[in-house]
Regions:
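Alpha-helical tetratricopeptide repeat
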Residues: 1-258
Length: 258
């Protein structure tokens, strides 16, 4: 293995990289950092070793070391957009969204075609409830990488909050096309269909959620309410007791069952 090869020839830097990757898989970040230290000492201009070492520092929550490392990378490779993005991620872990936004913007100035950076930027906008910004940023991420299911689900949330219901529905549909078992997309689409008065198709979505998560009592409650609304009284008589058993003080379910 890599350790045996290193013992035979300790000056082949790629062996340290291979062992570091193995250690990362085992979440031995300290060991991986030690290997990258040796690899960098032998090959100081291999950018990925610097970058991977910084990621290990982030994963081991050595945030100050990770910031210092990203600073070193940026000094050596000023046009390396991923280093700016990584620096932003460190600031996010330090709960400083202002600094994080600044470094994400710098990353996007260098490489405006990186979908993951747009996704991180959009997630920050969602957290701040800047819905219109999140909609635009997720649009860019989706344009660049159109098969990321989570981006459609998140953009649907942004669009709901700017009253673009048609756009939100299209995003939920696309998320489910890409990932048919995504129960969150099914659940949220069910809620949106209720809002749009499409009760029968909403029931279909809640049926799917309950099939995937039999103990999802909110989906059970919503399905019972909709079945009652559509005239199927046997449905709520079946669904409401399950909810009441779990939440005996939920007066809404008690009154609806009555």
């Amino acid at each position: 293995d890599a350790s045996e090869a290193i013992a035979l020839n300790p000056y082949i830097y790629i062996l340290y990289d291979l062992r570091a990757i193995s250690r990362i898989r085992q979440e031995d970040y300290a060991g991986a950092i030690a290997d990258y230290n040796k690899a960098i000492a032998i090959s100081p201009d291999t950018r990925n070793y610097w970058f991977n070492r910084a990621i290990c520092m982030l994963n081991s929550k050595d945030y100050d070391d990770a910031l210092a490392q990203t600073d070193s990378i940026i000094r050596k490779w000023q046009r390396f957009a991923n280093a700016y993005q990584l620096k932003a991620e460190v600031w996010l872990n330090k709960k400083d969204t202002v600094e994080a936004a600044k470094w994400l913007d710098k990353s996007l100035e260098i490489d405006p075609y990186d979908a993951s950076t747009w996704t991180i930027r959009a997630n920050m906008s969602l957290a701040r409830k800047q819905w219109a910004d999140a909609d635009k940023e997720l649009g860019k991420a989706i344009h660049l990488k159109p098969k990321e299911t989570g981006n459609y689900v998140n953009r649907a949330l942004a669009r709901l909050n700017i009253n673009n219901l048609r756009g939100a529905m299209a995003d939920y549909d696309m998320a489910i096309d890409l990932e048919p078992n995504n129960f969150l997309a099914h659940y949220n689409r069910g809620l949106l269909r209720v809002q749009l008065g499409d009760d029968n198709r909403a029931i279909d979505d809640f049926d799917y959620v309950i099939k995937m998560e039999p103990q999802n009592f909110m989906a059970i409650f919503n399905r019972g309410t909709l079945k009652e609304k559509t005239g199927n009284l046997r449905g709520p008589i079946h669904d409401y007791p399950k909810v009441i058993e779990q939440f005996p003080n939920l007066w809404t379910a008690l009154s609806y069952r009555a």
